């Protein structure tokens, strides 16, 4: 078993971007939990339409953990069972003010779905529902979860340039 690094933070913190850059820097696989949670086959135009059951996600992730040497996972938290947590080498927690995170979520929705995400668009209701969910999320969700694990935790400021944070993290690993 190699290194399993989790990059976590609330929606819009920059988890996927940071995790992908870190994985490239340390030369290992990048995995985004969204690719495990959501089956992109059902509706490729709106891949977030149908999520897998939590138990299936845990099973898929456990198979990955048991089969991979090194990888960096992007996820809000690492609540995927004790086996997953036992494999964590390090957790990177990205902290970003709520207003910035929500703007990033909104901007990302528009980049991905364009006018379909706007009022009257095909995905407006789904996108609005997701935005409302992000806005209502408990700001302590990640830190509360972090307090339950026993592995090195590196906290970074997600408003800083990705390259600066990746350099800092790489030095600390």
Where do the PLM segments sit?
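Pre-Walker A (Motif I) flank of P-loop NTPase domains
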Residues: 1-4, 69
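Hydrophobic anchor at the beta1->P-loop junction of P-loop NTPases
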Residues: 7
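P-loop (Walker A) phosphate-binding loop of NTP-binding proteins
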Residues: 10
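ATP-binding Walker
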Residues: 13
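Walker A/P-loop
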Residues: 16
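Conserved substrate/cofactor phosphate-moiety recognition/catalytic segment
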Residues: 20, 24-62
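Conserved phosphate-donor/acceptor-positioning beta-strand/loop module used by diverse small-molecule
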Residues: 87-108
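Small-molecule kinase domains that catalyze NTP-dependent phosphoryl transfer to phosphate-bearing small molecules
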Residues: 114-165
């Amino acid at each position: 078993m190699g290194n399993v690094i989790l990059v976590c933070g609330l929606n819009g913190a920059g988890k996927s971007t940071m995790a992908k850059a870190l994985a490239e820097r340390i030369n290992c696989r990048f995995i985004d939990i969204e690719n495990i949670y959501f089956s992109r086959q059902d509706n490729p135009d709106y891949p977030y339409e149908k999520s897998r059951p939590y138990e299936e996600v845990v099973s898929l992730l456990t198979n990955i953990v048991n089969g991979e040497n090194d990888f960096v996972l992007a996820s809000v938290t690492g609540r995927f069972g004790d086996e997953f947590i036992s494999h964590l080498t390090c957790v990177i927690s990205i902290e970003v003010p709520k207003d910035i995170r929500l703007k990033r979520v909104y901007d990302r929705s528009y980049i991905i779905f364009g006018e379909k995400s706007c009022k009257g668009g095909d995905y407006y209701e789904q996108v609005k529902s997701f935005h409302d969910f992000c806005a209502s999320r408990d700001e302590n969700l990640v830190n509360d979860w972090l307090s339950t694990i026993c592995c090195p935790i590196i906290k970074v400021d997600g408003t800083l340039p990705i390259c600066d944070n990746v350099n800092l993290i790489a030095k600390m690993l």
